[in-house]
Amino acid sequence: MKTKLVNLALVWSVAFACSFASGFPQQPAQNQLPTGSLFSTEELAKGFGSHQFTPFGDPKFSLDILVPTGWESHLSDYDPGQLSHDTESPVPMIEFYPNGADDLGVNVQYMRVPGDKPVSAVVDMYAKSANGTIAARQQLDLPERKVEDFLMKTTDDSLGPVLNRVMAFRRGDIVFIATAWSVEEKYEQYKKIFATVLASFNPTGK
């Protein structure tokens, strides 16, 4: 993994990407799934760093994403058998979280999905497999991709109610699923950070 300081070009690209919500979402989505320029240029530069990852040691899966300053980040553990069965369930790629925290974090997964299956159907399946309830939903037009963006409520045996903001989009036969989650009582505090991080996710592999 390589880490570099966020530069002005990246700051502006993130702000630009966040501003492209398609249509006018209903008020609940606006409140719970914020988009747009949520931080100033100075706040972005101080509060986030651009990290580069190469999951599975495969350049085809290389990606860039903003990670909040001070958070721990690493490639996800996975079973090699998951890669050969990536049409059956999502495969973990990366994850990060505040130092020492176990009640919030961000992760990215991928799943190989036939081109004739819409991402919205993948989202529905993902929520069902997590025993989740979709509380708010919208579609975003971000540069080079259309994104299914939704807030899912789940229950963790140890943590209780959890809110998960999920953005999913397609690149070829790959659907990327980026999730930012927290215990319900912390979601309001972190929702702008989650929005900025998820919108910054950029697969760079070819």
Regions found by a protein language model. Name each.
Residues 109-111, 119-126, 191-199:
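Surface-exposed flexible segments
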Residues 2-12, 16-102, 140, 158-160, ...:
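N-terminal targeting sequences that direct proteins away from the cytosol to non-cytosolic compartments
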Residues 105-107, 148, 176-177:
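Surface-exposed aromatic
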Residues 90-121:
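A short acidic-to-branched-hydrophobic micro-motif
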Residues 111-114, 129, 181-185:
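Short, solvent-exposed aromatic-acidic interface loops
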Residues 109, 151-153, 179-181:
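Residue-level recognition of well-ordered beta-strand positions that form the cores
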Residues 80-82, 113, 119-171:
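Signature of long, low-cysteine stretches enriched in small and polar/charged residues
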